[in-house]
Amino acid sequence: MKPVIGYTLGDQAGIGPEVVAAALSSGELPAEAEYRLIGRRENVRMGRPNPESARHAFEHLEQAAQALREGVIDAVVTAPVCKETLHGAGFRWPGQTEFFAERLETKNYAMCLTGKKLTVGLATIHISLQSVPSLLNTEE
């Protein structure tokens, strides 16, 4: 059975839907997985993030978390959001990664960035570069 990867649309007033459409239509995604959109295209004011587009982005993140909990999807790819407007819509996490960790009740998680030739798992996220050295150790 193929793993199912969900894609959120991000902030639909910005580049989120374009990024997802480009990825899904590129022909470069592995055929060993199935891909599903989380949420639906909303009729929002385009051009700059706004409270309405942030509210929809937050709703789609909640839908993705529920789909993960229920086993409907196995992983999620999140499109870009504007954190400032997302926080204005009631999103209280530093980023989407921490949101999913809390919703899925896990302390063992990582943000990964994947490209054509390289996948990177980040050791730290959403902190200042100045703080990074004090947070790294060989035990973890």
Predicted regions and their residues:
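Short secondary-structure boundary/capping segments
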Residues: 27, 112-113
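Contiguous, glycine/small-aliphatic-enriched amphipathic segments in soluble metabolic enzymes
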Residues: 1-98, 132-140
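Short, well-ordered coil/turn elements that cap or connect secondary structure elements
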Residues: 30-32, 106, 115
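Ligand-binding beta-strand-loop-alpha-helix segment within the catalytic cores
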Residues: 113-140
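A glycine-rich helix N-cap at a beta->alpha junction
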Residues: 97-107
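Proline-centered loop/turn at the N-terminus of a beta-strand
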Residues: 34, 108-110, 119
